[in-house]
């Protein structure tokens, strides 16, 4: 006997949590199917949320009423704004997270979400009927039916843990891998590959000589992730900082053959920007030390995560090299590090909605798409969950543009270019990063989220009130002006050019502050911190933002030129076989997306455009 839903989400990690929550918020009857209820929201690797680029994604998830930012605010134990001394566009909110608090907060959130059922069962297969997905089957043969299914399997697809000579089939330590789902995807003809990632040993904090370490404190005034929160009530802690030594490197170099990559046993590619300590020793042989952050995993947990030394060497070697590190001479290990290899699906198999092209109704989100990181997974989960719900309701899909959100940048990169290594978000990936700031994600996305039906009433009311305050402040800032003579009399150095200057123009002068202007226009002092920050940023970036808006408008013209879904590229005779093959593989939805496919030349785009226009004229 089977029960039916509108949407089934398989997997309770970060992508699955956001997918289930978004689908339910958008009005779809949703089932979250996960192998263990107690591991929903588990932070399998590092105990942190946010960072450069990643913090932007968390803010965008939050602006669309997702859950990650609010849960991180409930569990954050060391908030820091990265790149604080640099411009607002590249600042990134980050926090160490208490694993238990985060997991408990996420579970409480999901268990209290309307439209959402949660069942503990290991999905083993998909139900496919008439060329479409129709549900899933668990290991016991129980069927769960839905016209939309979202796979958020993380590292579980044929996952294998490597530690020295040990090879252990697992999705993560203590959990069985998902074999049947992987076999089904291969059987359906999906283009798939292997990737790998790694994690360091977990250390017993009671055996660390903390007094010998450098200390990294939290910010004095923590900045929350969620726009709904204005303060952090969780106690804040410091992290320790230490360094590897030449002796550390000697031990690792002597035993490099134990490492997955250097043993020749690796079948998957690892993340370039999160290399193992073995990789660091080999690739940066001239360096005599590497920095390690010792990050407590919780307020009442002695477990410490040594960020910077993920490894796959044997337990014996791990303990040997750990005890050559200052402060860790007497350290005891709670759990040893390991590498894990797993299957992923080439994300060029997906539409920008994250629905698969090969099997209608099936959506993929998270590491199954070749990404790495909680934040990247959560953002994809939200998009997949939202689009699955919209599809069930017969509504237009939600596709986020590159000039609209980092979410749009990431998904466009994935579905257009694919991946050759685990994909991580950086601010440098965005062409419009002055516009796509962490501080204005709600301004970019909350109205759209409301229209899509994925933003609930509490956030909608909070955003509407904030938007009214911002609009009033901007209107006031443009309505009041100073002549050059008035400005000089007030103590400001401006050109005597006869031009009247409003608040924005005055703030463009580096030595003029809002407090200075408040002495002339007291209204300024009534603005709260959020409003003041936005006015200052918009004034500082005014000229640059205008240019980026023009560039974005130019991009939109290409994005607005839709390509037929059934376009036969073989009919375009002037295309090379290579370009024709790439276009057929990706099947871009717009001319803009076609232009971003590697190897597609301007000449090919011209031929493509001419062919489409001829077809429309016929």
From Swiss-Prot:
Subcellular location field: Cytoplasm
Pfam families named among the record's database cross-references: GIDA (PF01134), GIDA_C_1st (PF21680), SAM_GIDA_C (PF13932)
Positions that bind FAD: 11-16
SUPFAM superfamilies with a match to the protein in the record: FAD/NAD(P)-binding domain
GO biological process entries: tRNA methylation; tRNA wobble uridine modification
MF-aspect GO terms: flavin adenine dinucleotide binding
Keyword Transmembrane: no
Cellular component GO terms, alphabetical: cytosol
Residue positions binding NAD(+): 270-284
Cofactor(s) this protein cannot do without: FAD
Swiss-Prot/TrEMBL keywords: Cytoplasm, FAD, Flavoprotein, NAD, tRNA processing
InterPro entries according to UniProt: FAD/NAD-bd_sf, GIDA_C_N, MnmG, MnmG-rel, MnmG-rel_CS, MnmG_C, MnmG_C_subdom, MnmG_C_subdom_sf
PANTHER family with a match to the protein in the record: GLUCOSE INHIBITED DIVISION PROTEIN A, PROTEIN MTO1 HOMOLOG, MITOCHONDRIAL
Family in the record: Belongs to the MnmG family.
Function: NAD-binding protein involved in the addition of a carboxymethylaminomethyl (cmnm) group at the wobble position (U34) of certain tRNAs, forming tRNA-cmnm(5)s(2)U34.
Subunit structure, as described in the record: Homodimer. Heterotetramer of two MnmE and two MnmG subunits.
Protein name: tRNA uridine 5-carboxymethylaminomethyl modification enzyme MnmG
Lineage of source species: Bacteria, Pseudomonadati, Pseudomonadota, Alphaproteobacteria, Caulobacterales
